[in-house]
Amino acid sequence: MKKKILVIEDEEDIANLVKLVLETEDFEVQTVLDPLGAVDTVKRYQPDAILLDLAMPGLNGWEIFKRIRNDADIVQVPIAILTAKAQAFDEMVGLHVMKADAYITKPFGKQELIDKTHELFRKKTH
């Protein structure tokens, strides 16, 4: 059975690119462009992992992240942060303070996206 990935990204071109790349790795991928409905989509879709953009209008990625982590039904889903914030401090906050499972900076390469997505599942099994 294919692993299900939910991509929460307001930029349609980026969301479609991520979807295309991950589908070549035999993942089932769904995208959410509107951050306001993201948490409900997580509950409905029940993904095995989430790739979450931080800078979105209306509801930012950190707020979505907190809502997922505070919901008993979906708290266990691994989350990789997608962001243009490439400073070491930002990554430290994402991984060590917020407890994201991975941190992917934009622009990212195809192989980095693939590797970090696979890593989400290796972490989940340990």
Question: What residues fall within each predicted segment?
Answer:
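Receiver (REC) domain active-site loop signature in two-component systems and cognate sites
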Residues: M56
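C-terminal output helix
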Residues: P107-H118, T125
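Active-site residues of response regulator receiver
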Residues: D53, T83
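Active-site beta3 strand of CheY-like receiver
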Residues: Y45-L51
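Short hydrophobic/Thr-rich beta-strand motif most characteristic of the beta2 strand and flanking loop
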Residues: D26-L33, T41
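Conserved acidic carboxylate
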Residues: E9
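Charged docking surfaces used in two-component/phosphorelay signaling
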Residues: N16-T24
